Swiss-Prot record:
SMART domains found in the cross-reference section: Col_cuticle_N
Example of a GO cellular component annotation carried by this entry: collagen trimer
MF annotations from Gene Ontology: structural constituent of cuticle
Chain positions covered by the region annotation Disordered: 80-293
Biased composition range(s): Polar residues: 80-89
Disulfide bonds: none
Biased amino acid composition, Low complexity: 136-146, 169-191, 234-267
The protein, known as: Cuticle collagen 39
Role: Nematode cuticles are composed largely of collagen-like proteins. The cuticle functions both as an exoskeleton and as a barrier to protect the worm from its environment.
Residue spans of biased composition, Gly residues class: 108-117, 159-168, 224-233
InterPro entries per record: Col_cuticle_N, Collagen
Gene name linked to the record: col-39
Length: 323
């Protein structure tokens, strides 16, 4: 294999690898863009679930306030309190979420009239004519750039005719002329005298003559019998591995997971025990709030599991393509 052929082969292989690298980069960029779009969409869904949970919690707080107001009114009617011991030295609970934005305020009243301004100052009665200030002349500026060439001038007057020159020296000898035409054929000569009788002898055979020209091609022969079918050759070696195939489509979303176990109680003070119908009202409101919180927590867990699963699938695809 010659040098140019080797160079062409190496250049072709390098071009194939470069094209494959560019294709891989484009695929990775496409996967990253798809992953970012999916993440934004899932974050939007999660935000919607969070807003729904927050609205349900706000509604629960309103219901709790109503229940508390009913309990307070009933508590004022009783002469005696059967409540348990009140808790003391309780740590402050975590700050609640920000409230909903309030309504826009009313426009302000128009302002009053401003105070009168200061009296103006009288100007001069007459203007004096002043002479202009004469400044000394400055130094001359630098030379300007050369101007454009002017137009072409008119043609000059024709000159006087020149005088005749003297005879020049003899030139060099020229080359020999061409050969002349061949002369005419001379007249035939007179016949010569008869020769004497020579001795006869047999000479040696002369050398072989040159081979003659090749004869014409003969007529085509009869077609021969067809040969039998040859035996099948051995199997060739296995070819190189092909390019990795296109990634498969995303599988269907899995079924939502089972409900999580209820969490442990937070670090809040224990509520005092109550008796009567007021405890039943607050117990029902507390159970309703717990259901809302459990539903919101279940939605958050489902979304987190989906996001984590999709991230693992994306990472596996990127690793498979790089390999």
């Amino acid at each position: 294999m010659t040098g140019p052929t080797c160079l062409a082969v190496v250049a072709g292989i390098s071009g194939v690898f470069v094209f494959g690298a560019l294709f891989s980069v484009a695929q990775i960029y496409n996967d990253i863009s798809s992953f970012a779009d999916n993440a934004h969409r899932e974050l939007g869904e999660f935000k919607g679930f969070a807003n729904d949970a927050w609205n349900s919690m706000v509604n629960h707080d309103d219901a709790t306030r109503v229940a508390r107001s009913v309990f307070v009114r009933r508590h004022k009617k009783h002469s005696q309190c059967n409540c348990g011991p009140q808790a003391s030295n309780c740590p402050a609970g975590p700050p609640g979420p920000p409230g909903a934005p309030g309504d826009r305020g009313l426009d302000g009243q128009p302002g009053g009239a401003g105070n009168p301004g200061q009296p103006g100052v009288a100007g001069p009665k007459s203007h004096e004519q002043q002479e202009c200030i004469k400044c000394p002349a400055g130094s001359p500026g630098p030379a300007g750039a050369p101007g454009a060439p002017g137009p072409q001038g008119p043609n000059g007057q024709p000159g006087h005719p020149g005088q005749g020159g003297s005879q020049g020296p003899a030139g060099p000898r020229g080359p020999a002329g061409d050969a002349g035409a061949p002369g005419q054929v001379g007249a035939p000569g007179n016949p010569g005298q008869a020769g004497r009788g020579g001795q006869r002898s047999h000479g040696l055979p002369g050398p072989s003559g040159a081979p003659g020209p090749q004869g014409p091609s003969g007529a085509p022969g009869q077609p021969g019998q067809s040969g039998g079918q040859g035996q099948q050759g051995p199997a060739g070696p296995a070819g190189p591995d092909g390019q990795p195939g296109q990634p498969g489509q995303d599988g269907q979303a899995g079924a939502p997971g089972n409900d999580g176990a209820p969490g442990a109680d937070a670090a809040y003070c224990p509520c005092p025990s109550r008796s009567g119908s007021s405890s039943a009202v607050e117990t029902g409101a507390a159970e309703q709030g717990y259901r809302h919180r459990a539903v919101a927590a279940r939605h958050r867990n489902v979304i987190r599991r989906r996001v984590a699963k999709k991230r693992v699938v994306k990472k596996k695809r990127v690793v498979a393509r790089q390999a």
